[in-house]
Structures are given as structure tokens and as C-alpha cells.
Amino acid sequence: MHHHKKLSYAALGLGILFLSFIIIKEEPWNPFQLLEPKALADVITDPTQPQPLIISVGPAGLIKGAIEANPAKDKENLEKLRTRLSQESKTRQVVIYCGCCPFKDCPNIRPAFSLLNQMGFKNHKLLNLTQNLKVNWIDKGYPMN
């Protein structure tokens, strides 16, 4: 009996490990595709830098130079985004953000980022707004439109 219990704990541990691996694997971006807010703010405020295409895929407000694509959770908005992106070179630096809430709760970033993956973009990033646009961008005094 005692031995059996140990075994089931081991199996449970493996199960949890496996589950967390699946959850991590599921995101359409990898850690290298997360762009820190400060890094983007530095580029935006430096006219000598090539400017990325910044796309807001949520309702949170426009970062300086960003274009509004409306919430990507809606199919119609996602199709408009596809049309807009089809005019860009696949090597264009693209930064998407939502900023409505933490990533785990956000309905907009996954469809938008997955679209960039599917379309074969090579230099696309997700702005790493860990909480929201207000806390991670506006409150830090980074530039807005």
C-alpha cells in the first residue's frame, strides 16, 4: 500500500510537469519575441532608429506612432489586420500590443500573433505589458499618440 502511494505521487508530479509544459508550449510567441516596454520607448524617441510598425490589437489606447487594428478577438478585425499586413515586407519589424490586462486573460494577442506567424513574418514581437498599458507604459511616461 505504502509503495503504491509513493508511485501515484510520482505520477501526479509527472502529470503536473507535463501539464505545465503543455501550457508553456501553447503560446504562439517564444520568450525572444517579447519586447520590453523600455526598449520600444527608446526606439520611438530616437529618430535615427528605423521605426517598427506598431499595432494596437486591443482597446487600451495608442502608443506614439501606433496604428489601431481594433480588438483581434473579433474575426472581422483580424481579417482587416491580415489585409493591412499583406502590404508589408515579411522582414518588417512589427510590434503588437493590447494592454487590456495580463497576457493570461487577454483575448486579443494570441489571434494577432498567430496571424503574424501564419503569414510568415520574421521580425515580429509582442510588447511585454505584464499588467496593462497604463501600468507598464503610460505611468512610466513613455510616449503616447
Residue ranges and their predicted role:
Residues 38-43, 73-85:
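Alpha-helical scaffolding within the catalytic cores
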Residues 82-134:
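Catalytic cysteine-centered active loop of the rhodanese-like fold, especially the PTP/DSP P-loop
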